[in-house]
């Protein structure tokens, strides 16, 4: 019965993610109440950041910020699916998702937009296509996070890290 409940919730979450990833404010009516405030806050914050970047740098960063957040939410959904289905991913499966779920790529995009004196589409493309060192630096972040994760998080049912995948 619990598995059936989770599968129903999973399909609802996937539907919610579909609406949220369209980045359409009109889609907010399709979201459940608990997600409306979260989506509105994220939507407004990202629009404000993109507007400021366009005004100050002449570059539209919206698509890059949106992609980062959609990728992050999808990776969280993968981890949720593993957890609720009792699936123990292989180390490769875990790491293929974990370097995104640690939020490294989205932090790098936001850092670049906030700190860079000259924003270029080429650099944004490089950051959001996860080329070069992005996966590696995010993997280091994930490993450090998993190594330093306090035991109390593991005791409250926190999702597995690579050490209990092995």
Q: What is the role of each PLM region?
A:
Residues 1-166:
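Alpha-helical, largely C-terminal catalytic domains
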């Amino acid at each position: 019965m619990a598995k059936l409940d989770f599968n129903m919730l999973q399909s609802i979450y996937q539907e919610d993610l579909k609406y949220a990833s369209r980045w359409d404010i009109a889609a907010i009516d399709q979201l459940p109440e608990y997600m409306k405030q979260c989506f509105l806050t994220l939507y407004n914050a990202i629009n404000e950041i993109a507007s400021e970047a366009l005004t100050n740098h002449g570059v539209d960063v919206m698509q890059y910020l949106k992609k980062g957040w959609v990728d992050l939410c999808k990776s969280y959904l993968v981890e949720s699916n593993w957890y609720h289905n009792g699936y123990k991913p292989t180390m490769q499966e875990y790491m293929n998702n974990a370097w995104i779920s640690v939020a490294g790529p989205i932090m790098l995009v936001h850092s670049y937009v906030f700190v860079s004196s000259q924003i270029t589409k080429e650099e944004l493309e490089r950051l959001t296509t996860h080329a070069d060192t992005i996966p590696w630096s995010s993997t280091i972040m994930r490993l450090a996070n998993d190594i330093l994760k306090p035991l109390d998080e593991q005791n409250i049912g926190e999702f597995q890290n690579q050490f209990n995948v092995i």
